[in-house]
Amino acid sequence: MAMWIGALVTYTIVRAVPARSLTARTPSWRVLVQGLAPGLLVGVVQAVILAIIAHTVLDLPLLDFAPLLSLLLFAAATFAAVTFALTAWLGGAGRVLGVALVVAAVAGRAVSAVPAWFETIAPVLPLTPAMNGVAAFAAGAPGVGAAVGGLLGWLVLGLAASYAAVVRSRMAGSRGLARLSRSGA
């Protein structure tokens, strides 16, 4: 949850697709990488801190640190891509949706008497595979592989939606410039 909130706050402070990139000659994939960088940086820092805390609190064997950190880094990259896409496509509404997703994920974990419709959507929330993976890892139970698969699905979806948002934003910027040049402004 902390990494999701970190990514969400990052794209509240930093614009997902900077205005200067709308008309730059830089390829869209590079604009995407530059846009994802702040969220990834925050996520990496959070993942390292969380791995150290979890390793210490759970008294995990030293050999478990690298796999736990890898899972958290993968979750951080996934969260950065999904929150980038939400804010790039929907702006403020995407941020609100991001907050709603974290609230739903927390409610699904904390409240045992959730409505039936919620139990239907909870497994497909982007935070669910990360929380399931960390819980499985901490308990030494199976489920980490399924969690990685779920995160991979969300990562691919997040990157595709993010790239499409960058392309759309840049096309809108070109159209806006074309309108300005036609109007003589």
Where are the regions that the model predicts?
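Membrane-spanning alpha-helical segments of multipass transporters and channels
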Residues: 1-185
